[in-house]
Amino acid sequence: MKFIVIKIGGSTLSDMHPSIINNIKHLRSNNIYPIIVHGGGPFINEALSNQQIEPHFVNGLRVTDKATMTITKHTLIADVNTALVAQFNQQQCSAIGLCGLDAQLFEIKRFDQQYGYVGVPTTLNIDSLSYLCTKFVPIINSIGFNNHDGEFYNINADTLAYFIAASLEAPIYVLSNIAGVLINDVVIPQLPLADINQYIEHGDIYGGMIPKVLDAKNAIKNGCPKVIIASGNKPNIIEAIYNNDFVGTTILKSSV
């Protein structure tokens, strides 16, 4: 089976171009199995704000206490994931919403005590996911379940998406409000792994892009053939990426 993992950023979910679903239907008609992974940071922040809970971050990662976890789980599963599945089904693209608990999709462990209920994926149930792909478009949110302590955990959605891509040895399209990796304010079309550390050391890659490219580097080292970072608000962006005719950045082992 040929898979493509598509990570849809929280900022893109509310402004997702309608052609994305049609492009995904087209992939499936060609026996390519897309897997959607999403987070929902802006929606979580809004839900926390409505409950007068201030979000707290350490080193760019959300600290998730028990109250925050309850709201995060409800927001991602009941609100964001359900709404996304509904969009797909309304366009006659049969989708199924999943978290890590469903079909024992993936196992997790606690990331670090200081971050509270934040987990990292450890094992992907490839058999379950492969079977679901033959029937539906899986739409996976970033909530996992820890079988050892019986608790739900929040997972960084980028980390989860890269983990799934590496486990399946599949390419990943990372769609957000970012057009690609910028060097001197210009989107670079290719970023070989060997150049990443140099760009970071020189300050050309900085801020929130650093964890994105380092996660991409790790995914490629673990089996993902390539990572594409592009804007999810462009028409027919998935088809354009598949046909290698797009504005964005392809991160890969070596330049082509």
Swiss-Prot record:
Substrate binds at residues 40-41, 62, 154. Keywords: Amino-acid biosynthesis, Arginine biosynthesis, ATP-binding, Cytoplasm, Kinase, Nucleotide-binding, Transferase. Pathway: Amino-acid biosynthesis; L-arginine biosynthesis; N(2)-acetyl-L-ornithine from L-glutamate: step 2/4. It is an enzyme of class 2 (transferase). Coiled coil: none annotated. The keyword Cytoplasm applies. GO terms for molecular function: acetylglutamate kinase activity; ATP binding. Its EC number is 2.7.2.8. GO terms for cellular component: cytoplasm. The keyword Translocase does not apply. It is found in: Cytoplasm. GO terms for biological process: arginine biosynthetic process via ornithine; L-arginine biosynthetic process. InterPro entries: AceGlu_kinase-like_sf (IPR036393), AcgluKinase_fam (IPR004662), ArgB (IPR037528), Asp/Glu/Uridylate_kinase (IPR001048). It holds the Pfam family AA_kinase. The record marks 7, 212 as: Transition state stabilizer. It catalyses: N-acetyl-L-glutamate + ATP = N-acetyl-L-glutamyl 5-phosphate + ADP. Belongs to the acetylglutamate kinase family. ArgB subfamily. HAMAP family: ArgB (MF_00082). Catalyzes the ATP-dependent phosphorylation of N-acetyl-L-glutamate. This is Acetylglutamate kinase. It comes from Staphylococcus aureus (strain MRSA252).
